[in-house]
């Protein structure tokens, strides 16, 4: 009797919960969207200094924003797409139940803010990372986005299959990374990002282009050199303390992630393509690239 009673009851409760959750989700989305777009407007119209942690993703930007959010006088935003072309392309990929992801709406609001307040100084922080390590991390953080709703559960796949998927993601990310710098830095702010030199030994560099103050750096040296550069970039009297990045163990996928990292071995010719890219040659020393190759080469 309890089974006959329980199944319909549980189905009914699940439907009620689904309807309630959907309404809450919609209201929560609208509240968060309004809060973030108002924050953009207040930052550009007021006394706060806008700081855009503007990256192509999975390069440690969350840790930097966490630190900046503890400071007064700044309005910080973690962004991936601000340019019109970038937002349009991302919108076609980031589908969220017929709603725009909030970070794309924020990107559009930031672009409007920069147009409406042309004299406002804008600070931009961007980071890079070993492209192979980044692609593997991105796969584990965004499997549905990369593989689709029916792409399968990475945790239930053989390690060999996940390794194959990771290799394919590396290939697809190369062009994305190059286009991102052209669109989201050079195109958006009106200068050739790669025309100026980069201090590859220090791993970070500050430059100014008109209203833009830009700090670019390497994730691999963030814990060593990032704090002093960020402090100087923000006009602080001391280094900016950066929290440790989240350990992979906290995600519940540590074992598979480490197995994939250890099992992923790529042909030398393919690594030539990866590490001879414009982005890698701009940011990394030959010794650093050799170190990456030793990790990943078959």
PLM regions with names:
Residues 2-298:
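Membrane-interface amphipathic segments in extracytoplasmic regions
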